[in-house]
């Protein structure tokens, strides 16, 4: 960030002055600043020679500052690489700001300065590139939570995100026990697990007139055959099973990301198509084809096995109290 500031200052110095008079004033101020720095350096040098302890503290401080600058620069390089490798998919909104929030940049530089490992540098690099793509993704609170996240909780969250669909993950796919989910909740990454939440499938009909339950997005989803109904679906009053019929609707329990968790999930690679495929397999149980992953193609809606008689694309599920 500091390197960018210096580059910007040079650009202003070259093109930002309107006429020769202002350029002269600017240069005079620069010369004065350089003289003040030189004078300060001389005074500091004399003090260091007279006080060995001060010299040692100064050397330690300079070394620390140099390491911090290297950490920031390395994180910045990784952010630039990520932007080059993964350009924004859509057009930039008309109201998108031209510059990033200075408060965000200051806080990001503070945290990135402590990134001593390649993994942590990559994390802060992705955070910066994500914020550049979509300003406002990371609040100051989110940055603080991410900085304070311990290694064990970070690993748990990565496991959670491997089953993520949008802002939630199906309980059917989560390989996390109650204590691990509680750790994510206490870290502020998911919403309170005690209050059950569920998504509701919509009902649809395929080209042969067969009835299905469907859930997904504009591009892909999962469809569940109503007859015969998979054995993984349970029925009955006061039923809180992961996949159940309630009020004549198919509901599926999910764990939901918090705002902080949703922002952090953006920088964690995951394959949503593979998640839908896994979900279809789990729901099918011992009945092959009872649930299928579907996707939208140029030819229309296709099931994972290539069938063109897949049910219409479902709408994204709305999370409700279970």
Residue spans for each PLM region:
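Non-transmembrane, amphipathic alpha-helical segments
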Residues: 108-112, 141, 145, 176
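Eukaryotic partner-binding/assembly regions in large regulatory complexes
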Residues: 3-125, 304-305, 310, 316-322
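Accessory beta->alpha helical hairpin/"wing" motif in late/C-terminal subdomains of nucleic-acid enzymes
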Residues: 102-112, 118-132, 191-282, 286, ...
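Extended alpha-helical scaffold and adjacent linker segments that couple domains
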Residues: 1-16, 20, 27-29, 33-61, ...
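Basic amphipathic alpha-helical segments that dock to polyanions
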Residues: 175-191, 196
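Generic structural signal for hydrophobic core residues of well-folded globular domains
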Residues: 4, 111-115, 127-131, 146-149, ...
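Short amphipathic alpha-helical interface segments
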Residues: 138-173
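Long, low-complexity, charge-rich intrinsically disordered regions
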Residues: 278-322
């Amino acid at each position: 960030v500091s390197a960018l500031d210096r580059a910007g200052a040079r650009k202003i110095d070259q093109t930002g002055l309107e006429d020769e008079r202002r350029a002269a004033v600017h240069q005079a101020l620069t010369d004065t600043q350089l003289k003040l720095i030189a004078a300060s350096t001389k005074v500091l040098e004399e003090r260091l020679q007279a006080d060995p302890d001060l010299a040692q503290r100064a050397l330690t401080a300079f070394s620390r500052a140099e390491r911090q600058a290297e950490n920031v620069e390395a994180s910045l390089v990784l952010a630039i690489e990520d932007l080059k490798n993964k350009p924004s998919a859509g057009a930039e909104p008309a109201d998108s700001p031209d510059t990033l929030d200075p408060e965000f940049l200051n806080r990001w530089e503070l945290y990135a300065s402590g990134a001593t490992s390649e993994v942590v540098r990559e994390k802060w690099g992705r955070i910066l590139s994500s914020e550049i793509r979509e300003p406002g993704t990371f609040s100051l609170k989110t940055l603080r939570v991410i900085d304070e996240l311990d290694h064990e909780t970070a690993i748990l969250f990565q496991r959670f995100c491997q089953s993520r669909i949008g802002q939630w993950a199906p309980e059917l796919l989560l390989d996390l026990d109650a204590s691990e989910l509680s750790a994510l909740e206490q870290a502020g990454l998911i919403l309170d697990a005690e209050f059950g939440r569920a998504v509701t499938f919509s009902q649809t009909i395929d080209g042969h007139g067969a009835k299905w339950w469907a859930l997904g997005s504009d591009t892909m989803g999962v469809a569940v055959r109503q007859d015969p109904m998979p054995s993984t679906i349970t029925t009955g009053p006061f039923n809180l099973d992961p996949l159940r019929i309630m009020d004549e609707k198919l509901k599926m329990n999910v764990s939901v990301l918090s705002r902080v968790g949703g922002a952090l999930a953006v920088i964690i690679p995951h394959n949503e198509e593979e998640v839908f495929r896994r979900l279809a397999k789990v729901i099918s149980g011992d009945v092959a084809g009872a649930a299928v992953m579907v996707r939208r193609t140029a030819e229309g809606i296709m099931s994972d096995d290539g069938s063109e008689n897949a049910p219409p694309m479902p709408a994204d599920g709305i999370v409700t109290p279970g």
